[in-house]
Design a protein with these regions (language model features):
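DNA polymerase processivity clamps
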Residues: 27-31, 73-94
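N-terminal intrinsically disordered, cationic/polar leader segments
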Residues: 7, 20-24
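Intrinsically disordered, low-complexity regulatory segments enriched in Ser/Thr/Pro
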Residues: 43-55, 99-119
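Short loop/beta submotifs within extracellular cysteine-rich repeat domains
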Residues: 49, 71-76, 108-110, 136
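Intrinsic, low-complexity N-terminal interaction/targeting segments
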Residues: 33-40, 86-109
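Mixed-charge, glycine-accented linear interaction segment located at domain edges/termini
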Residues: 106-140
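Short, well-structured hydrophobic secondary-structure segments
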Residues: 32-74
């Protein structure tokens, strides 16, 4: 996987050699000088579906994602980006090592894509590291 310079806030994938399901949140552009919005897109890839959903994130959204990661570490369901202004993202622990991930484009297409995933051990710590990298984009 080749990442661009700005990377991905979220990257959840099945192990190599399995279904190949991937859900990611790519950072497309840095905030404008003095700006407080990050231009991103959710990308969902399965054997039969590939879709992308534009999303704009604020620093408050990043704080909410940090809280969501804490809930996931406690094996709890999370729903992130619930304001209705953008795509909604949900993760539900469903089995040991397994999660159900859904992306719902309420404001625009009304499409929901749900994907079962078995991310690698340590995936929550990986998401936390990605969050810290993305937060640095806001600070310069």
């Amino acid at each position: 996987v080749v990442e661009d310079d700005l990377g991905e806030l979220i990257y959840l994938a099945d192990p190599p050699g399995t279904s190949g399901h991937v859900v990611s949140l790519r950072v497309l552009a840095r905030p404008a000088p003095g700006g407080d919005v990050l231009d991103c897109e959710f990308v969902v890839e399965t054997e039969t579906v590939k879709g992308s959903f534009p999303v704009y994130l604020t620093s408050d959204d990043l704080d909410d994602w940090e809280e969501a990661l804490g809930a996931l570490a406690g094996n709890r369901f999370v729903s992130w980006l619930n304001s209705g202004r953008t795509v909604q993202f949900k993760i539900k622990p469903v089995s040991p090592g397994g999660i159900a991930v859904s992306v719902h484009d309420g404001p625009s297409s009304q499409v929901t894509v749900s994907v079962p995933l078995f991310p690698a051990t340590g995936w929550i710590d990986d998401q936390r590291a990605r969050l810290e990298k993305v937060r640095r984009l806001f600070s310069g």
